[in-house]
Design a protein with these regions (language model features):
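Membrane-anchoring hydrophobic helices of lipid-metabolizing enzymes
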Residues: 1-66, 78-79
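Short active-site segment of divalent metal-dependent hydrolases/proteases
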Residues: 150
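Catalytic core of membrane glycerolipid acyltransferases/transacylases, capturing the structured
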Residues: 7-10, 14-22, 61-120
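Residue-level preference for the first positions of well-ordered beta-strands
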Residues: 64-66, 139-145
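Cofactor-binding loop segments of dinucleotide-utilizing enzymes, especially the Rossmann-like FAD-
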Residues: 70, 95, 147, 179-180
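Membrane-interfacial amphipathic helices and adjacent loop/beta segments
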Residues: 27-56, 88-127
Length: 243
């Protein structure tokens, strides 16, 4: 419990800095990325170990992309912008209710996230197409969690094609991301914020970009990459029917 308190102390401390100095962070993906890096450093001080693997091709990327990752906890929403190098500025497609959260929601709103309800898939996709165009024109990439919600057990049928459809529509590349972030658990009262287990390693792997030709093949490639990395990290306990 003490470790959890200290972890949240550091997270909230950094998020409040964003709220009280919004002019510095408003639509500024560099400073928000730096804040994300600071949160990671603070969590390292709490005892959490990180493993980060980035394909060399990412460092030379000069165009926007659709970043497709599995979804395990709120931790990736806090950290992913600081995992990518500065040349890849990115924002999120996320559930609308997150914007209404105290502190966390205000921080997310500093940038330009695309908020959807997940109640009407067709309407959600229309919103995404409209708002994504504006972000891509600013060379801002979009992070998509196609599972729709957090899962501790990864299974292929959880993944929707929303990310690959978006990438194909605008002819931008896809960047697969595998992650394990169950060091931050799910809460009993508020699902998004649970206890920390500092004995669990937090892992991120960013694959090289590719263009979508066939949506099914693209999804198979993404899920295969995620599965492979989770196995390499010794976390087969998180996999279900992903052979």
């Amino acid at each position: 419990m003490k470790k959890t308190f200290v972890c949240y102390y550091h997270i909230i401390k950094e998020l409040l800095k964003v709220i009280f100095n919004q002019k510095k962070y408003y639509h500024n993906y560099i400073t928000c990325g730096e804040k994300s890096i600071q949160i990671r450093k603070d969590l390292e001080k709490c005892g959490i170990k990180f493993r980060i693997e980035i394909a060399p091709e990412i460092y030379g990327l000069e165009i926007p992309a659709v970043i497709i990752a599995n979804h395990m906890s709120t931790l990736e929403t806090l950290l992913l912008q600081g995992i990518f190098p500065e040349n890849v500025k990115c924002d999120y497609i996320l559930k609308k209710e997150l914007i209404n959260y105290p502190i966390f929601g205000k921080v997310l709103s500093v940038l330009q996230p695309i908020a959807i309800t997940r109640k009407n898939p067709r309407l959600d996709f229309e919103i995404i197409l409209k708002e994504a165009k504006n972000l891509f024109e600013q060379n801002i990439s979009l992070i998509v969690f196609p599972q729709g919600t957090r899962y501790n057990i990864i299974s292929p049928e959880q993944f929707t094609t929303i990310g690959v459809k978006l990438a194909k529509h605008y002819n931008v590349p896809v960047i697969p991301v595998a992650l394990v972030t169950d060091a931050m658990g799910q809460g009993k009262l508020i699902k998004d914020f649970g206890k920390f287990d500092v004995t669990k390693e937090v892992c991120f792997a960013i694959d090289k970009p590719f263009y979508v030709v066939n949506q099914k093949e693209a999804m198979n490639h993404i899920v295969s990459f995620i599965t492979k990395k989770v196995k390499e990290w010794g976390r087969t306990d998180l996999l279900s029917n992903c052979e």
